[in-house]
């Protein structure tokens, strides 16, 4: 693992067979499988008397917050793969499930979108 002192940011280099960003997304969705992650779930109550769930892997190192995409959840392939790596590193990971994305319908008509960050702000 690199420390902050010797960390260097490098440019992303696409694989030769996935030059198009759309093909990268499609490939991941079809060919990559999710990992099995043992989460601990916490429910956070929001100021508007609704809720969202956060699935957690406990560790001792840095904390990573993972945000799923549209109609995703903490069980999305990219999230479970990330959380598996976080777990192996001994870090803590918080996978937020935006409203109505944890398998339970919420109490209010409010749903999430990328422009609404109040739930993420509450988690942080």
Where are these regions (language model features)?
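Catalytic nucleophile-loop/oxyanion-hole region of alpha/beta-hydrolase
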Residues: 99-124
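N-terminal cap/lid segment of alpha/beta-hydrolase-fold proteins
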Residues: 21-58
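Short strand->helix junction
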Residues: 71-73
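Hydrophobic/aromatic beta-strand patches that form the interior of the parallel beta-sheet core
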Residues: 42, 65, 94-96
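Conserved alpha/beta-hydrolase
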Residues: 75, 83-107
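N-terminal presequences and immediately downstream first alpha-helices
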Residues: 1-32
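Active-site-proximal cofactor/substrate-binding loop regions of enzyme domains
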Residues: 64, 93, 118, 122
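Short beta-strand element of the alpha/beta-hydrolase
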Residues: 61-69
């Amino acid at each position: 693992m690199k420390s902050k002192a010797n960390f260097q940011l490098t440019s992303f280099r696409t694989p030769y067979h996935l030059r198009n960003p759309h093909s990268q997304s499609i490939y991941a969705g079809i060919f990559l499988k999710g990992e099995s992650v043992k989460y601990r779930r916490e429910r956070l109550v929001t100021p508007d008397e609704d809720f969202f769930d956060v699935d957690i892997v406990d560790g001792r190192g840095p904390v990573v917050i993972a945000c799923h995409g549209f109609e995703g959840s903490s069980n999305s392939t990219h999230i479970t793969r990330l959380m598996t790596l976080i777990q192996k590193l001994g870090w803590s990971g918080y996978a937020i499930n935006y409203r109505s994305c944890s398998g339970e319908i919420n109490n209010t008509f409010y749903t999430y979108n990328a422009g609404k960050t109040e739930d993420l702000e509450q988690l942080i």
